[in-house]
C-alpha cells in the first residue's frame, strides 16, 4: 500500500465531482423548464441512467474503446487510463447533482422572480438560480465525491490504481488484518465526513414543491441557455444511457451467447435473485419495525463505506470455529448486504409511515380493525407504492453489488454481478454482454411479477366484496 494512492484517489474523486456537478446542474435547468408527461419521461431517463450497474457501463465503453473495441481503430482513446475512469464515473454519477438541484430549483416561486423583474438569462443564473441551488450542489458534491472515492469496480476493471482498489487487492492476497486496520481507517473517515456535512441540513426533494410554471421559467431563462441545456441533456442521455443499452441490445453476439450464458451461469442467476430478494425483504420488514427510532439514521455510514471494508470487518468477526455454521454460507452474504443497505429501508419506511393520514390511523386504532383490513384499506392505498419502491431499490442495489460480497462469497455462491466483474478483468468478453442482459431481465422480473400479482389480488378482492 502507498499513501500516494490516496492522493490519486482524491484527485480522481475531485475531478469526477466537479464534472458531475457542472453537468448535473446544467441539465437540471432543462428539467425545470419541462412540464407534464415530457418531464416524467426525462426524469425516468435520469433515474435509469443512475440505476445502471457500474460493470455494465464499463463493459459498454470497453466494447467501444477497449483493446479490440469497435471504434478503437478510428479514435485513439485509451479506456484503460485515469481519464477513462474519470469519464465512466462522471457518466454514472451526474444524475445525483441533477436530481438534487432539480428539487432545489423547484422551490423557485413567482414572488421571487417578481421581486426582480429585470433579471433574465445569465443574470438569473448568477443571482437567483445558483444561490437557490447552492446547498443542493454542496450536498450532491459530497455524495459524488464519496461514491467516486470508494468505487472499486470501475478503477479495478480499467486497471487504474486507487487507494480502495489497492486495499482490496492486497487484503485478498494476504488476509493481513494488521494492514487492513492500518489503512482502513481512511476509508471509514470519508463517510463520516459525509454524515457531518449533512448534519442538520435539509434536502430539497423534487416532490415537495409544485415549482414555477415552466413557460414563465423558460421565458426568463432565455433562448440561448434553455437550448444549450436541452442539447446537453440530449447528448448526455445518449452517451450515458442509450449508448450502453444500444451496445448491449444491438450486438448480435449478445443474443448468440444468451442461451449459453444461462446454462453456464444458472447457479449464479439463482444466487443473484435469491440474495437480492431475501435482503430487500428483510431490510424492508426491519425498516418498518424500527422506523420510529432516529438512532438508526447512523446506518447511512454503512452505505457509504467501501463494500470491501465491510467484508473485512465481517471476516474478522465471524471467522471463528464456533461460527462455522454461519461463516462461509449464504446467510453471511445476506446479513452483510442487509447492513450496508439498511439505511434505505429505514429511511424509506420512515418516510412512508410519516405520510399516512394521522386521522385515519386514529380511526383504525379506535375501531380495532385487523391487520389485514388495516393493510387493505389504510396502508396499501396510501403507501403501498412507496413500500414497493423502497423494496425495489434495495433489490437493485443488491443485484448489482460486487464490492460487498467479493471477499465473503461462499463456495458455489458466486453472483452474476461478481462473475461479470471477474470476467471484465481480462478485457471485454463476448459472454459479458449476455450476462448483463440476464441481469437486466432479473431487474425487471419483480416489476412483471408485481404487475401480475396486483391484477390477481384486485380480481380476488372484487370477488370477496361481492
Which positions does each model-derived feature cover?
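Transmembrane alpha-helical segments of polytopic membrane transport and secretion proteins
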Residues: 199-235, 451-466
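Membrane-water interface segments at the C-terminal ends of transmembrane alpha-helices
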Residues: 1-106, 132-152, 182-199, 224-253, ...
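Short helix-to-coil transition segments within interhelical loops
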Residues: 106-133, 160, 356, 362-383, ...
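Solenoid-repeat scaffolds in large eukaryotic assemblies
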Residues: 115-116, 179-180, 364, 431-433
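Glycine-rich helix-loop "coupling/hinge" segments at transmembrane-helix boundaries
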Residues: 76, 149-175, 399-430, 466
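Peri-membrane helix termini and adjoining interfacial loops of integral membrane proteins
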Residues: 63-75, 158-164, 205-213, 249, ...
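Juxtamembrane inter-helical linkers in multi-pass membrane proteins
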Residues: 116-124, 206-221, 255-256, 260-261, ...
Amino acid at each position: 500500500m502507498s499513501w500516494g494512492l490516496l492522493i490519486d484517489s482524491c484527485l480522481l474523486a475531485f475531478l469526477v465531482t466537479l464534472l458531475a456537478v457542472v453537468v448535473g446542474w446544467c441539465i437540471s435547468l432543462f428539467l425545470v423548464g419541462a412540464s407534464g408527461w415530457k418531464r416524467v419521461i426525462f426524469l425516468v431517463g435520469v433515474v435509469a441512467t443512475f440505476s445502471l450497474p457500474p460493470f455494465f457501463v464499463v463493459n459498454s465503453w470497453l466494447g467501444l474503446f477497449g483493446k479490440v473495441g469497435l471504434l478503437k481503430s478510428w479514435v485513439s482513446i485509451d479506456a484503460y487510463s485515469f481519464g477513462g475512469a474519470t469519464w465512466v464515473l462522471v457518466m454514472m454519477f451526474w444524475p445525483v447533482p441533477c436530481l438534487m438541484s432539480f428539487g432545489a430549483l423547484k422551490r423557485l416561486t413567482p414572488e421571487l422572480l417578481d421581486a426582480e423583474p429585470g433579471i433574465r438569462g445569465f443574470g438569473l443564473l448568477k443571482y437567483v438560480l445558483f444561490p437557490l441551488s447552492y446547498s443542493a450542489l454542496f450536498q450532491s458534491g459530497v455524495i459524488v465525491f464519496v461514491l467516486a472515492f470508494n468505487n472499486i469496480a470501475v478503477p479495478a476493471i480499467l486497471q487504474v490504481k486507487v487507494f480502495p482498489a489497492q486495499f482490496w487487492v492486497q487484503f485478498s492476497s494476504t488476509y493481513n488484518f494488521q494492514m487492513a486496520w492500518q489503512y482502513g481507517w481512511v476509508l471509514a473517515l470519508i463517510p463520516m465526513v459525509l454524515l457531518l456535512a449533512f448534519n442538520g441540513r435539509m434536502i430539497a426533494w423534487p416532490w415537495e414543491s409544485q415549482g414555477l410554471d415552466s413557460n414563465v421559467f423558460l421565458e426568463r431563462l432565455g433562448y440561448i441557455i434553455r437550448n444549450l441545456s436541452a442539447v446537453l441533456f440530449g447528448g448526455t442521455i445518449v452517451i450515458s444511457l442509450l449508448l450502453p443499452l444500444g451496445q448491449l441490445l444491438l450486438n448480435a453476439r449478445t443474443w448468440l451467447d444468451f442461451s449459453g450464458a444461462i446454462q453456464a451461469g444458472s447457479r449464479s442467476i439463482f444466487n443473484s435473485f435469491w440474495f437480492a430478494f431475501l435482503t430487500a425483504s428483510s431490510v424492508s420488514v426491519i425498516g418498518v419495525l424500527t422506523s420510529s427510532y432516529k438512532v438508526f439514521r447512523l446506518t447511512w455510514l454503512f452505505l457509504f463505506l467501501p463494500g470491501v471494508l465491510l467484508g473485512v470487518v465481517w471476516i474478522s468477526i465471524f471467522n471463528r470455529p464456533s461460527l462455522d455454521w454461519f461463516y462461509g454460507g449464504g446467510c453471511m452474504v445476506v446479513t452483510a448486504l442487509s447492513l450496508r443497505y439498511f439505511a434505505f429501508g429505514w429511511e424509506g419506511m420512515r418516510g412512508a409511515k410519516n405520510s399516512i393520514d394521522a386521522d385515519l390511523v386514529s380511526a383504525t386504532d379506535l375501531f380495532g380493525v385487523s391487520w389485514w383490513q388495516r393493510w387493505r384499506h389504510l396502508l396499501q392505498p396510501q403507501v403501498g407504492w412507496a413500500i414497493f419502491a423502497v423494496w425495489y431499490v434495495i433489490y437493485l442495489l443488491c443485484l448489482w453489488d460486487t464490492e460487498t460480497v467479493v471477499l465473503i462469497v461462499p463456495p458455489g455462491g458466486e453472483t452474476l454481478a461478481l462473475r461479470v466483474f471477474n470476467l471484465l478483468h481480462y478485457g471485454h468478453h463476448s459472454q459479458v454482454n449476455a450476462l448483463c442482459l440476464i441481469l437486466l431481465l432479473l431487474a425487471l422480473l419483480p416489476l412483471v411479477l408485481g404487475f401480475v400479482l396486483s391484477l390477481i389480488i384486485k380480481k380476488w378482492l372484487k370477488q370477496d366484496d361481492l
